[in-house]
């Protein structure tokens, strides 16, 4: 009787449809801060879920961090292929209840969390949000017609192509 009970208990255990690699070849983080482009973010996530098949990621991992509810919280999710369900799934890895996309320390912590939660040999970062070209976040919002012509069309020597990104009030400079 005891052997039969042990056998039944072993058979009832569900086998996971996804086993993340201990060390992925590559982890890609899609970081989409802010709320003003939320419909586009949702469309992007759905597109990724459609693209993730049983072979799409190989030994890699796909993370998405976005702010679906408001400007002060964020969620980091992994999109993966579940071989039992035969479709892509999204799993929340971490939630941020007090997140400021304009705070370099908060964004740095988010990147560190991604590396800890999905360790990899290589990392990729995709940022999807508003950007201000080479204007720093402190430059405010200026219509192009108000800027001097050479400030609009000529980058400062040694400047990176993008200097800041994010929603108004939540911009972050790239240094």
What do the predicted segments below correspond to?
Residues 105-175:
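Chitinase-like catalytic core of GlcNAc-active glycosidases
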Residues 1-4:
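Sec-dependent signal peptide recognition
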